[in-house]
């Protein structure tokens, strides 16, 4: 998969591709990337890429011309273009799985008040919001999307990890609690079931704790889970 990021500040993005698991994925040939600086496509002598908003209002808007030139520069026939914006559709793990099947993802990083709507109308396949909050940097949102997608690609991480983690393909629940050494930390001991060696009991404990956490922290996901399994198996009676 190739990630192409169009940004006013590509230097924010670059280090992510040079470290940790992403670096290994690139070395394996699983991932490639291109960073495009919108300023390189500005015809303004000062390389400005923003202007005042028609109709008035606070803040500046990214201009259509340099953004259009930057997008036309991308040489890909099977690209999916995404603009990250608080006004977009809600980003979910399900959408991350869908995007992980694409060949190339082009990400437009917003700044200021956003970009000229005509760029969205002409070029964007998905306008996506990573949450109900506002960032000053579209680059941060881009990194969230990139990280959530590339880790789903074959050969990046252990596929079993994807089944057990929060929002995983297995059941959609939040992940169960984890413990490691030491056994006793500040008077709190690891639950006995986890050191019992009884794999079936451990499996049942983890499912119970995952359901418990999901019900407490994300009741909306808990209700979806109940719809999937068709019943609550008496879980509510235990709490």
UniProtKB/Swiss-Prot annotation:
A single MF term (Gene Ontology): tRNA (guanine(37)-N1)-methyltransferase activity
EC number of the protein: 2.1.1.228
GO cellular component: cytosol
InterPro entries reported for this sequence: Alpha/beta_knot_MTases, tRNA_m1G_MeTrfase_C_sf, tRNA_m1G_MeTrfase_TrmD, tRNA_m1G_MTases_N, tRNA_MeTrfase_TRMD/TRM10
Subcellular location field: Cytoplasm
Protein name: tRNA (guanine-N(1)-)-methyltransferase
Family: Belongs to the RNA methyltransferase TrmD family.
Source species: Borrelia garinii subsp. bavariensis (strain ATCC BAA-2496 / DSM 23469 / PBi) (Borreliella bavariensis)
CDD domains recorded: TrmD-like (cd18080)
KW Methyltransferase (keyword) present: yes
Residues engaged in binding S-adenosyl-L-methionine: 110, 130-135
Keyword Methyltransferase found: yes
Disulfide bonds: none
Gene Ontology terms describing biological process: tRNA N1-guanine methylation
Keywords: Cytoplasm, Methyltransferase, S-adenosyl-L-methionine, Transferase, tRNA processing
Its job: Specifically methylates guanosine-37 in various tRNAs.
Gene from which the chain derives: trmD
Enzymatic reactions: guanosine(37) in tRNA + S-adenosyl-L-methionine = N(1)-methylguanosine(37) in tRNA + S-adenosyl-L-homocysteine + H(+)
A Pfam family assignment: tRNA_m1G_MT
Subunit structure as annotated in this protein's UniProt entry: Homodimer.
Top-level taxon of origin: Bacteria
């Amino acid at each position: 998969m190739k990630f192409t990021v169009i940004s006013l500040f590509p230097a924010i993005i670059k280090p992510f591709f040079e470290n940790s698991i992403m670096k290994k994925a690139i070395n394996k040939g699983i991932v490639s990337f291109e960073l495009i600086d919108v300023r390189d496509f500005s015809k303004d002598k000062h390389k400005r890429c923003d202007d005042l908003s028609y109709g008035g209002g606070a803040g500046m808007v990214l201009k259509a011309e340099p953004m259009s030139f930057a997008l036309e520069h991308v040489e890909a026939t099977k690209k999916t273009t995404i603009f990250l914006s608080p006004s977009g559709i809600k980003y979910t793990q399900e959408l991350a799985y869908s995007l992980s099947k694409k060949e190339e993802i082009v990400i437009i990083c917003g700044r200021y008040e956003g970009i000229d709507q005509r760029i969205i109308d002409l070029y964007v396949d998905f306008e996506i919001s990573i949450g109900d909050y506002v960032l000053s940097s579209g680059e941060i949102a881009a990194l969230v999307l990139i990280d959530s997608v590339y880790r789903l690609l074959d050969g990046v991480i252990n596929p079993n990890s994807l089944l057990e983690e929060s929002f995983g393909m297995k059941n959609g629940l939040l992940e169960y609690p984890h413990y490691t050494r030491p056994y006793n930390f500040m008077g709190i001991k690891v639950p006995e079931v986890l050191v019992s060696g009884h794999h079936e009991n451990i499996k049942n404990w983890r499912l119970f704790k995952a359901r418990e956490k999901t019900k407490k922290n994300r009741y909306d996901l808990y209700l979806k889970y109940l719809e999937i399994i068709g019943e609550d198996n008496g879980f509510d009676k235990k709490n």
